[in-house]
């Protein structure tokens, strides 16, 4: 399944006609904006260390579409295979050269389905990602808490030692003062 998805995606990314150039550039802009939004949301979730890494929006967009097709075919099974899943069985609405008159309407329906699926899969993956991030943060917080507890115990021992030394010196001074 995954091997067949890559060549079909490459074929669909190439625009053969002049009229499709406008639609293709609009689709590319949409993919870039969706990829940028996802990248921004992921960077907010991952924190400052992950923000430093920069990813090419076109690479993210093509990887997301490929992952969408693979994940969708695994999750939904045969129900959606003929309904416009990228890399699965052919669909007349997905390729503009087969239906030139109604290609814009069919393409927008295909893109809406693709974006909805992308949003669903993205949320599931983000939930898993958020859980992993929370686990790591919980581990770091636990380690820091252990360190602070050890530090607190050490300070408590030092305070007790200092207090006993102060008390013993006061008693010694009192005894010496009384002897004079």
Curated annotation (Swiss-Prot):
GO terms for biological process: apoptotic process; negative regulation of apoptotic process; negative regulation of mitochondrial calcium ion concentration. It is found in: Mitochondrion; Mitochondrion outer membrane; Endoplasmic reticulum membrane. It holds the Pfam family Miff. Keywords: Apoptosis, Endoplasmic reticulum, Membrane, Mitochondrion, Mitochondrion outer membrane, Transmembrane, Transmembrane helix. It is a single-pass membrane protein. Residues 84-93 have a biased composition (Gly residues). Residues 96-107 have a biased composition (Polar residues). GO terms for cellular component: endoplasmic reticulum; endoplasmic reticulum membrane; mitochondria-associated endoplasmic reticulum membrane contact site; mitochondrial outer membrane. The chain crosses the membrane at residues 160-178. Its main location: mitochondrion. GO terms for molecular function: ubiquitin protein ligase binding. It comes from the Eukaryota. Residues 77-108 are annotated as: Disordered. Involved in the regulation of endoplasmic reticulum (ER)-mitochondria coupling. Negatively regulates the ER-mitochondria distance and Ca(2+) transfer from ER to mitochondria possibly implicating it in the regulation of apoptosis. May collaborate with RNF183 to restrain BIK protein levels thus regulating apoptotic signaling. Interacts with BIK and RNF183. Interacts with IMMT/MIC60and EMD. This is Fetal and adult testis-expressed transcript protein homolog.
């Amino acid at each position: 399944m995954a091997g067949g998805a890559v060549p079909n995606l490459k074929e669909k990314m190439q625009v053969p006609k002049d009229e499709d150039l406008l639609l293709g550039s609009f689709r590319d802009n949409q993919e870039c904006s969706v990829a940028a939004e996802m990248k921004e949301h992921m960077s907010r979730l991952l924190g400052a260390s992950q923000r430093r890494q920069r990813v090419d929006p076109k690479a993210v967009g093509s990887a997301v579409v490929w992952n969408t097709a693979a994940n969708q075919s695994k999750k939904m099974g045969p129900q959606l295979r003929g309904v416009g899943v990228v890399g699965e069985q052919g669909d007349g609405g997905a390729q503009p050269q087969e239906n030139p008159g109604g290609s814009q309407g069919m393409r927008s329906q295909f893109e809406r389905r693709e974006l909805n699926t992308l949003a669903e899969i993205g949320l599931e993956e983000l939930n898993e990602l958020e859980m992993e991030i929370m686990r790591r943060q919980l581990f770091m917080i636990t380690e820091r808490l252990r360190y602070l507890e050890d530090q607190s115990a050490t300070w408590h021992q030092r305070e007790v030692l200092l207090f006993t030394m102060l008390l013993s010196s006061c008693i010694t001074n009192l005894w010496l003062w009384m002897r004079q």
